[in-house]
From Swiss-Prot:
InterPro entries noted in UniProt: Cbl-bd_cap, Cobalamin-bd, Cobalamin-bd_sf, Corrinoid_p, Met_Synthase/Corrinoid, Meth_synthase_dom
PANTHER family hit by this protein: METHIONINE SYNTHASE
Organism, as annotated: Methanosarcina acetivorans (strain ATCC 35395 / DSM 2834 / JCM 12185 / C2A)
Record-given protein name: Monomethylamine corrinoid protein 1
Domain (B12-binding N-terminal): residue spans on this chain: 1-91
Amino acid sequence: MANQEIFDKLTNAIATQNVAGCAQLAQEALDAGISPLDIITKGLSPGMKIIGDKFEAAEVFLPQIMMSAKAMEAAMKVLTPELEKTKVEGEEGTGLAITFVAEGDIHDIGHRLVTTMLGANGFDILDLGTDVLNETVVEEAAKHKGEKVLLVGSALMTTSMLGQKDLMDRLREENLRDSVKCMFGGAPVSSKWIDEIGADATAENAAEAAKVALNIMK
């Protein structure tokens, strides 16, 4: 099977919530000599984008999102051990990544993928999970003041994305803004929005997120 054919099948498996098929295809891709990173960026991530776009357009609903998340999780169980083999310990530019999904949002497909990629690139991880209050994020940032800290928030819905502005405001109020870097992602997040709220960066996919994170933490 050609690589592109495998990628297309992976994309379809995510978009159609095929949990068992997604895990099997991930293993087939590894067996074919495809790197875990390519499997994620060229196979799984496009499927996540499809399901995210359909959710925004109200073409699919929460049950489908949850099943796509399970399909992604099944694939990542296969891929994570391979990613761990390439993990870079103590590389300059890394630090503590505090990852979370915005308050009011429980859609963690992209969040889990980004968290995995950051860990594979040498970051220590503090995963706060989904539906996280801004107050909780600020408290954790305060606990680690003086360390190299990257806040990584994701939002699939426009409504939950708006909370990112409130988080930035709270960080400034608590005099924490200068002690952390802030990166946000998710379907509705744009570079224009990042500039508007005064954050540091965004990324279109998990692989890019890891590269951007390493760069801004140097």
